Amino acid sequence: MKLDLSAYLVIGPENCSRLVEDVIAAAVDEGFTCVQIRSKVVGAREMISVLEKAAQVIDELGKSDSVALLVNDRLDVALAAREAGIKVDGVHVGQSDIPVEVCRKFLGADSIVGLSANTEEIISAADVSCVDYFGVGPLHATDTKSDAGAALSFEKISKLVKVSRLPLVVGGGVKAEDLPALAATGANGFFVVSAVAGADNPRRAARELVDAWILSVDNSAGKPYNLRG
């Protein structure tokens, strides 16, 4: 699978007032390219159930080979889901979670392993042989991850992009109006939680974000406007 970080949805049951799989289906149908299931409140069995439903709706949209489905932190859940026949593409972990080399050992070379990082020192020192991308943030303070640290400026993100040997996806309170400046940093994409999962109309919110990102990337590259069709 070719990993596309352009539009990355992070979602769990506590983020939604509707079915998680319905929000995922709407977002993926509108152009989101990566989905991470994250929850700090539900148990392993419910996480596996959510993964199964997410994998099903992604498959029904014909995007199992182009939209990665990841699990936050829970290597055990990813492995158990795979044992149950669910297509899980990998995990995303933080600095205090299971080491990336352990994730790589158990998931295999063809799986995706993402790592949270927000300083030049961490990104420069990371063993990139075990990691596929860095998750960077927060761009703004956000209620969905209170321990995310201090907000990063666009200037700081630009510096992180320059020192990184891997693709970077940036999130933390990201809104559509942030995307032109974010695209200009050279980041490979954005991730959101509440901007889609907590929206009154998740489909419309997803469409607006995808359109804004495509337009912003085109403008940063000096291309004409290119609204998605």
Range-by-range predicted roles:
Residues 140-142:
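A short, flexible beta-alpha/helix-coil linker loop
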Residues 1-92, 96, 105-133, 149-155, ...:
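Conserved N-terminal beta1-alpha1 strand-loop-helix module at the mouth
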Residues 144-146:
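Glycine/threonine-rich flexible loop motifs
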